[in-house]
């Protein structure tokens, strides 16, 4: 039994190490986590979106940037990572925990963290020394501005139930776009180490 466990550990270490690329493939697990997160967001619905129509806002989701051909492969990974990180940050707040069912919120945050952890296995290899420059990359700045608009909206609306419902619907759109980006990356080869 100990031998089998040791062998499995060795295989995992080799596949995720610098020589192996298993850790940098966009796996089915990542896509399953994304779908599960969307289902959780849907289940978090507490109000009818129709009752909050007066609070609607266009947050300027950079959908065309992600779904179009504007992003190159070397930009797509950092944008995907930033979208997931910002989504996690949004839901991992005191204001958020006051607005949602705690169990569903914890499951959503765990799912987002799992996606980020999976991407973290590749992040250093994909972004390397360019990491500091990528923070200033236009698509990343666009994503940050988009999420800042969401934070500003919530604050302006006093973190009301309707404001959170509008944001929940918006985050379903954003996570759908990030899933589309994951699919694009997979079609680009899936191996995030390849140029």
Curated annotation (Swiss-Prot):
Subcellular location: Secreted
Pfam families attached to this UniProt entry: Interferon (PF00143)
CDD domains, sorted: IFab (cd00095)
Entry comment describing in which tissues the protein is expressed: Constitutively and exclusively expressed in the mononuclear cells of the extraembryonic trophectoderm.
Covalent S-S links between cysteines: 24-122, 52-162
Gene Ontology process terms (BP): defense response to virus; female pregnancy
SUPFAM superfamilies tied to this protein: 4-helical cytokines
Keywords: Antiviral defense, Cytokine, Disulfide bond, Hormone, Pregnancy, Secreted, Signal
Organism the protein comes from: Ovis aries (Sheep)
UniProt entry tagged with the keyword rRNA-binding: no
SMART domains: IFabd
Family matches, as InterPro entries: 4_helix_cytokine-like_core (IPR009079), Interferon_alpha/beta/delta (IPR000471)
Molecular function GO labels: cytokine activity; cytokine receptor binding; hormone activity
Record bears the keyword Transferase: no
Function, as annotated: Paracrine hormone primarily responsible for maternal recognition of pregnancy. Interacts with endometrial receptors, probably type I interferon receptors, and blocks estrogen receptor expression, preventing the estrogen-induced increase in oxytocin receptor expression in the endometrium. This results in the suppression of the pulsatile endometrial release of the luteolytic hormone prostaglandin F2-alpha, hindering the regression of the corpus luteum (luteolysis) and therefore a return to ovarian cyclicity.
GO cellular component, one term: extracellular space
Chief location: secreted
Residue ranges that the Swiss-Prot or TrEMBL entry lists as coiled coil: none
Signal sequence segment: 1-23
Protein name per Swiss-Prot or TrEMBL: Interferon tau-2
Family as reported in the entry's similarity comment: Belongs to the alpha/beta interferon family. IFN-alphaII subfamily.
Additional observations: IFN-tau genes are intronless. They evolved from IFN-omega genes in the ruminantia suborder and have continued to duplicate independently in different lineages of the ruminantia. They code for proteins very similar in sequence but with different biological potency and pattern of expression.
């Amino acid at each position: 039994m100990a031998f089998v466990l040791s062998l499995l550990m060795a295989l995992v270490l080799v596949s995720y190490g610098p020589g192996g690329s298993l850790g940098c493939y966009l796996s089915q697990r990542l896509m399953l986590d994304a779908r599960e997160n969307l289902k959780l967001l849907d289940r978090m619905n507490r109000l009818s979106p129709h009752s909050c129509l007066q609070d609607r806002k266009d947050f300027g989701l950079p959908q065309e940037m992600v779904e179009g051909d504007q992003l190159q492969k070397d930009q797509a990974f950092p944008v995907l990572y930033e979208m997931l990180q910002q989504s996690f940050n949004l839901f991992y707040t005191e204001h958020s925990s006051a607005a949602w069912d705690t169990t569903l919120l914890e499951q959503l945050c765990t799912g987002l963290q799992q996606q980020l952890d999976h991407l973290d296995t590749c992040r250093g290899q994909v972004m390397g020394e360019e990491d500091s420059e990528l923070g200033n990359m236009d698509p990343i700045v666009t994503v940050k501005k988009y999420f800042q608009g969401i934070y500003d909206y919530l604050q302006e609306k006093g973190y009301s139930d309707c404001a959170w419902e509008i944001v929940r619907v918006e985050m379903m759109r954003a996570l759908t776009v990030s899933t589309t980006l994951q699919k694009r990356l997979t079609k680009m080869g899936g191996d995030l180490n390849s140029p």
